[in-house]
Amino acid sequence: GEGGVFGAMLSIAGADTNFFLVAEEDCDVLYVDYDHIMKRCPKACAYHSTIVRNLVRLMAEKTQALSEHLEILSHRTTREKLLAYFHMLAAKSRSSYFTLPFSQTNLADYICVDRSAMLRELANMRREGLVEIDRRNVKLNLHKTL
């Protein structure tokens, strides 16, 4: 997404690894030499401290997102994965109403399931009154999903 960072963890870990990345849309990539960032500049300027602080914050956010994704993927069935993800989004929005951050195709990819199987499961969940879905808008009926 906009303002995103990739490869930072590899740089910090000292990994000498190549990786392949595909952007979903046009973007600019800025290469920043890790060693240059981590060494204090001679003036110990505030800009340098801000860059380091922002980099650490971005890495913490990435770590949290990866942890959340792993938690969702740890569930066995498509229904369990969907409910885990929906409960997480509901908790973040502090509401049973939330908007999916991406398309249903990307949702299927995110939870590592077949799209048609996921859509079938969503239809079953809708029929059982667990969720109400209108495109990307979701209402999770919490009293039925606990």
Question: Language-model segments: which ranges?
Answer:
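Cyclic-nucleotide recognition modules
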Residues: 1-56
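Phosphate-/nucleic-acid-contacting segments
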Residues: 78-81, 87-146
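An amphipathic alpha-helical interaction segment
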Residues: 54-64, 81-88
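A general alpha-helix detector
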Residues: 36, 65, 103-106
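Short helix-to-loop capping/linker segments positioned immediately adjacent to catalytic or ligand/cofactor-binding
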Residues: 18-19, 39-48, 65-74, 92-95
